[in-house]
Amino acid sequence: MLYPRNLALFSLLSLSSAAPSQVERSPDAVLKPRAVCTPTAGGSPSIDDVPAIRKAIASCGNGGTIVFPAGSTYYLNSVLDLAGCSNCDIQVEGVLKFSGSTEYWGGKTAMLNIDMINGLRLRSLTGSGVIDGNGQNAYDRFASDKNYKRPTLLYITGGSNIEVSGLRQKNPPNVFNSVKGDTQHVTFKNLRMDATSNSQNPPKNTDGFDIGASTHVTISSVSVTNDDDCVAFKPGSNYVTVEDVTCTGSHGISVGSLGKSGPDVVQNILAHRITMIESTKAAGIKTYPSGNGHGLSTVKNVTFSDFNVRGCDYAFQIESCYGESESYCESNPGNAILQGIVVKGFSGTTSGKYDPVVANLNCGARGTCDVSMSAFSVKAPSGKATVLCDNTPSSLGVSCTSGASG
């Protein structure tokens, strides 16, 4: 005898076995392979391969894959705009080499432009892919012409769900990577980045990452050799994580500069497991003082932790008089709001440039300085470890010596 509950179950099983599933009935549910395009390279620096790449994007950019094969070189003599890529996968196993023309690139914003794109992977699966900014001519020209405007190598504005990974980026004329325009969910990982000059003119202003107005940006497993900030948290950066990064020759992991011409906010930043080699500072915060059209700078919920300091001039620095003279700041003190700033787990040895000083914390006299330091064991080569402080809280966590500047 079938009880009502068993009868209902039997009826359900009979119905499910009698009728085929929707997956079986619907051919539309079968996954289709991604379209794959390989742009045709012109094979000569005199031939601009950007039109061929744009043609490939038109054919395969909507959900497809664009492949630059290993052993190939594509010469890019104009801006490469990735417009038309949506949920696309760009696999660079060869070399994308931009021209060194200072005439063409002067005044351009970007060399490789990602504007309002949702869903894009720009990557090398093998680690052989190179994006070469060919910046030597720009380094030399900028040395004699400080008004020369140079482009950023990779410029991301707006959009979401963007990944840049596995690549080598080399010799940008200016900044390596810039993110702004309220971009969301960007990941940079497994990158090797180097800006080096073969003349006496250094690769100026080659920030590794300028992270502006954006949320949920992650930078991980990256090495940077350059001549400016390794990572700079610019106005509007929010929820940014930087981890397992090695920076050589840089100006540090930096918040700012902020407040130059209006109010600026940076918040919810975590930088941890960082190795800093021969940098002007390992980490720091740069804000403009009050007056002269400067705006209020607000820095909230920022943690710098587990830094290995190797030959950096300062292990940590706070500058509240950035961009102005000491005499100016005596009349127009810094007014930045620093709230929830945590510095912990710093170890290693400074360069000795400021021996015995290892850190310089100059908080603004008219601002807020909610900063804490712990497990801070960095020493100068002499074995001493002086921390200069002005306007810091009594609960800072380290012994202070007056005389901070900057």
UniProtKB/Swiss-Prot annotation:
**Which Gene Ontology cellular-component terms appear in the entry?**
extracellular region
List the transmembrane segments: none
Q: Give disulfide pairs as residue numbers.
A: none
Q: Main role?
A: Pectinolytic enzyme involved in the degradation of xylogalacturonan (xga), a galacturonan backbone heavily substituted with xylose, and which is one important component of the hairy regions of pectin. Activity requires a galacturonic acid backbone substituted with xylose.
Q: Which GO terms describe its molecular function?
A: polygalacturonase activity
Under the heading InterPro entries, the entry gives:
Glyco_hydro_28, PbH1, Pectin_lyas_fold, Pectin_lyase_fold/virulence
Could you tell me the keywords of this UniProt record? Carbohydrate metabolism, Cell wall biogenesis/degradation, Glycoprotein, Glycosidase, Hydrolase, Polysaccharide degradation, Repeat, Secreted, Signal
Where does the record say carbohydrate is attached? N301
| Family in the record | Belongs to the glycosyl hydrolase 28 family.
Q: Which Enzyme Commission numbers does its entry carry?
A: 3.2.1.-
Signal sequence span per UniProt? 1-18
- Where in or outside the cell is it found? Secreted
| A GO BP entry | pectin catabolic process
Mostly located where?
Answer: secreted
**Superkingdom of origin organism:** Eukaryota
Q: Which Pfam family, an example, fits this chain?
A: Glyco_hydro_28
Give coiled-coil spans as residue ranges: none
Instruction: Provide the top EC class.
Output: hydrolase
What is the protein named? Probable endo-xylogalacturonan hydrolase A
Q: Outline the PbH1 repeats, range by range.
A: 183-213, 214-235, 237-257, 299-320
Q: Which residues form the active site?
A: D228 (proton donor), H251
